[in-house]
A protein has these predicted regions:
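Polytopic transmembrane helical bundles with strong interfacial aromatic enrichment
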Residues: 1-295
Length: 295
């Protein structure tokens, strides 16, 4: 394979992996939001004695939604295998190790998904399922940045570097609190599923307050990255992040004051994924060994 062809394929397969790892979060959320979490009431079978839905299941159309999401896991797995094999045959050791993680993570997700079903959609397992996906998305951003030659020789000023780390940590806190809020709210995935024994109003307020802190930090990062010539690339990413935050905040408040309709909650999940991708892109340029970009 020619060098230019290899480079192009590397970009495409790593982008496909990022899209797949992000997309499965959204489809998984749709399963929950449509009350289809137990559409296939067992695992690995869809219904006792059959890997696929069968006519006459009491779960009705929910079985097709849940089974469809399970089937998408094989697509995500196939893409992660292709990414790893390509890296193994063509790339340096460091990217080979990182490219192995989406493959392992996808397999773990399948098992965790099974545990989630077998525990009756307990919110703790649903939350773990989502947070593992968030980790895989961050890893996928890092891998794509490598294949996309997303590098810079500039070293961030210390104040910008520290600010990026703080924004990353607070952004992660926003995501975690968002999942706890979800685990305390009405969209459990099935009418019999348990919920966290928390006051939804209190946890939602805490989530909203953390979001306000996060947006304030993003505005601060916009300012300091703008006035530092060495961090213009940070300014561009932060500007995108700020726009996403505004849209995400608007959706968040509208959904709350309209009784959390599943369509708006789905859009909020998409916004959360896009927010996290932008945060992960910022983190690539920090001095943190785990987060920073590969060379």
């Amino acid at each position: 394979m020619k060098t230019t062809t290899k480079a192009k394929f590397g970009r495409r397969i790593s982008l496909a992996n990022l899209i797949a790892q992000s997309g499965i979060i959204v489809t998984g959320a749709i399963v929950r939001l449509t009350g289809s979490g137990l559409g296939c009431p067992t695992w690995p079978d869809c219904t006792p004695g059959s890997l696929i839905p069968v006519a006459g299941q009491v779960e009705g159309f929910h079985k097709y939604i849940e089974f469809g999401n399970r089937t998408l896991t094989f697509l995500v797995l196939a893409i992660s295998i292709a990414l790893f094999v390509f890296s193994l045959l063509n790339e340096k050791r460091n990217i080979i190790v990182w490219s192995f993680l989406p493959l392992i993570g996808t397999l773990l997700q399948a098992v965790l998904g099974g545990i989630t079903v077998l525990t009756g959609l307990h919110p703790a397992t649903v939350m773990a399922h989502f947070l593992l996906s968030i980790v895989l998305v961050a890893i996928s951003v890092k891998i794509y940045a490598y294949f996309n030659n997303q590098r810079t020789s500039k070293v961030l000023p210390k104040i910008v570097d520290n600010y990026v780390k703080i924004v990353t940590l607070v952004g992660l806190a926003v995501i975690v609190l968002g999942t706890i809020t979800t685990g305390s709210g009405p969209h459990s995935g099935d009418e019999i599923a348990a919920r966290f024994n928390l006051d939804i109003r209190v946890i939602a307020w805490l989530h909203a307050d953390t979001v306000l802190l996060f947006v304030g930090l993003v505005v601060g990062l916009l300012v300091i990255s703008r006035i530092n010539p060495e961090s213009k690339h940070i300014y561009k990413i932060t500007r995108t992040l700020f726009i996403i935050c505004l849209v995400q905040g608007f959706i968040g408040y509208v959904q709350w004051f309209n009784g959390l309709p599943w369509i708006l909650v789905s859009l909020h999940v998409i916004g959360a994924v896009l927010t996290w991708i932008a945060i992960a892109n910022l983190a690539l340029y920090s001095s943190n060994t785990f987060l920073k970009r590969l060379k």
